[in-house]
Amino acid sequence: MFQALSDGFKNALNKIRFQDDEKALDRALDELKKTLLKNDVHHKVARELLKKVESQTKAGGIGKQQFLDALEKSLLEILSAKGSSGFTFAQTPPTVVLMAGLQGSGKTTTTAKLAHYLKTKNKKVLLCACDLQRLAAVEQLKVLGEQVGVEVFHEENKSVKEIANNALKRAKEAQFDVLIVDSAGRLAIDKELMQELKEVKEVLNPHEVLYVADALSGQDGVKSANTFNEEIGVSGVVLSKFDSDSKGGIALGITYQLGLPLRFIGSGEKIPDLDVFMPERIVGRLMGAGDIISLAEKTASVLNPNEAKDLSKKLKKGQFTFNDFLNQIEKVKKLGSMSSLISMIPGLGNMASALKDTDLESSLEVKKIKAMVNSMTKKERENPEILNGSRRKRIALGSGLEVSEINRIIKRFDQASKMAKRLTNKKGISDLMNLMSQAKNQTPPKMR
C-alpha cells in the first residue's frame, strides 16, 4: 500500500541528522517534493503539503521528530475530507446506495464487499444488478451475492430504469435495511453512460452515490471522479485495489483537490477485504508504524469477549505486549488476504505486495518475530520495557538472530504501540472497547 510513498518519506526524514539545520530541512523538503511528484500527487497538493510541513517543522525547532510530526499532521489534514469514513444509514429504511465507476475499477466486486460489510453489522441487504452493458456482469453479481449470503435482484428483458424501480419496490416490501445497486460501467466516460446513471438516480433517489476508483489510476482517477461528481453528484469514494503497488496521488487528490470523502478502501481480493477509511490509521501505515488498532479489529471476530475487552484496555494504555502480538498473528491467519494484514504489522508494510499470495506462516520476517518472542521469558514478553542490552543479546543467541535485528523489531513494535495509544484516545475515533467487543452475535455499535 503506497510503499513507494512510504519509502520516500523515510528517505526525506534521513536527510535531517542534526538539530536546527535549515540546509538539512531544505534537502528533506526537496526529497519529499520528488517523492510526491513521482507518486502522481498533483503539484498543487504537493505544494500545499510542503508548505505545511516546512512551517510546522520550523515552529517546533528543526529536527527529525519535528519533521516527522509535521508530516504526519499535514497528511492527516489533507486526507481528512469532511464526511470521510464509513457508511451513513437513512433514518427510514431502506438505505439506497448507487454504485458508480468505470469498467475495470472493481465496482461489482466492491458492491459485494460492501454487502458483506453491512451484513456483519446485522443489516439485511438486497443487491440489484443494473449493469447490463458488460457481458456476465449480472452473473458475476449473482455468484458474489451467493458467496456473501444476500439476495440479488435481477430481471431479464427490462430497461435499467424498470429494474431499479422494481428492486426498490422489493426492498421496501421485504423490509430490507439496505439496497445496493450495481450500475453499468464503461471503458471511458461518455454521454450515454452519464444519461443512464442520471435516469437510475432519478428513479432511486439514493441516499448515497459511491464512486469506485481504482487506486492504480492516479490523476486520471481523480479526473474521472470529478467528472462523475459534476454529472451525477457523488457522496463518497471507495478506493479499490488499495493493497496493490499503487501510488498515493489519487487518495490525496480526491480528498484535497475534489473535497470528496473517502469512505472505504479495498484492502485485498477476498470478500471481507473492505475497510472503513480512517485517515489516522492510513497515515500510521505510511509512516511505517503499522496499524495495531485495525489489526485488533480484524481479529475481533475470532476473540472471545473477555479477550477483546482485555486487548482494548491494553491498547488504550499503550500496554500491548509481545504475547498479545504473537497471539494476534496466530489468529489473524484466518482472516482476509495476507497483503492487507501484513501492512498492519509494524515493520512489515514494505512486504505487503510481495506477500499477496503468500501464507503468513511462511513469511521470513514473521518467523523472525516468532523466534524472537519464543526466546523471551514470560516476564520479558509481558514487559517489553525491561529488554536491556544483556537480555537482547541472550534473546538474539536463542533465536538465531543478530542483535541489530532484535533491536529493529523491538523499535518498530514500540513505535506502533505508542501510536495505537495515541489514536485510541483521539477525539472522533470510536471507543476501541466497543469495537473490540463486537464478537459474533453481539449488537453492533451505532454507526454514523
From Swiss-Prot:
Compartment(s): Cytoplasm
Keyword terms: Cytoplasm, GTP-binding, Hydrolase, Nucleotide-binding, Ribonucleoprotein, RNA-binding, Signal recognition particle
Binding-site positions, GTP: 101-108, 182-186, 240-243
Gene3D superfamilies: P-loop containing nucleotide triphosphate hydrolases (3.40.50.300), Signal recognition particle SRP54, nucleotide-binding domain (1.20.120.140), Signal recognition particle, SRP54 subunit, M-domain (1.10.260.30)
Highest rank taxon of the organism: Bacteria
Main location: cytoplasm
Annotated PROSITE patterns: SRP54
Catalytic reactions of this protein: GTP + H2O = GDP + phosphate + H(+)
Family matches, as PANTHER family: SIGNAL RECOGNITION PARTICLE 54K PROTEIN SRP54, SIGNAL RECOGNITION PARTICLE SUBUNIT SRP54
Protein name per the record: Signal recognition particle protein
Organism: Helicobacter pylori (strain J99 / ATCC 700824)
Gene behind the chain: ffh
